[in-house]
């Protein structure tokens, strides 16, 4: 799993925290950030430079027969797919954690209100005698 990341020398893909992608001239620059260890100020990162793929395609303008376009490198596309899987998984885990915490807070509120209601009923019973 994560063969493309491993081919880049990333031996522990599960340590990937996030990534950024930018275009610089005819290159795409991919920067991968890893989770910080305790006591570190900055996250470790690695940078990769991919040349953009040049393609000649039929022009939609009738007067010009062909035009040259630049596209993302196919290998980079595969790497980004794997990075998206990793980063999305982390987001799903965070969302699930947030949902569980919200459910706990709601349950706590419901139980607190129910206890107050029962105590009020008990108070009515003891004061009624």
From Swiss-Prot:
<dbReference type="InterPro" id="IPR020911">
    <property type="entry name" value="UPF0325"/>
</dbReference>
<dbReference type="Pfam" id="PF11944">
    <property type="entry name" value="DUF3461"/>
</dbReference>
<protein>
    <recommendedName>
        <fullName>UPF0325 protein YPO1040/y3141/YP_2811</fullName>
    </recommendedName>
</protein>
<comment type="similarity">
    <text>Belongs to the UPF0325 family.</text>
</comment>
């Amino acid at each position: 799993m994560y063969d493309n990341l491993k081919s880049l020398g990333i031996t522990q893909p599960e340590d990937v925290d996030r990534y950024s992608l930018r275009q610089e001239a005819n290159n795409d620059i991919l920067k991968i950030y890893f989770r910080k260890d305790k006591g570190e100020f900055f996250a470790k990162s690695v940078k990769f430079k991919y040349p953009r793929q040049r393609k000649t395609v039929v022009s939609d303008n009738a007067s010009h027969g062909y035009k040259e376009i630049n596209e993302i490198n196919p290998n980079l596309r595969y790497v980004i797919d794997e990075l998206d899987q990793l980063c999305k998984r982390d987001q799903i885990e965070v969302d699930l954690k947030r949902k569980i915490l919200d459910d706990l807070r709601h349950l706590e509120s419901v139980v607190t209100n129910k206890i107050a209601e029962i105590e009020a009923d008990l108070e009515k019973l003891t004061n009624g005698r």
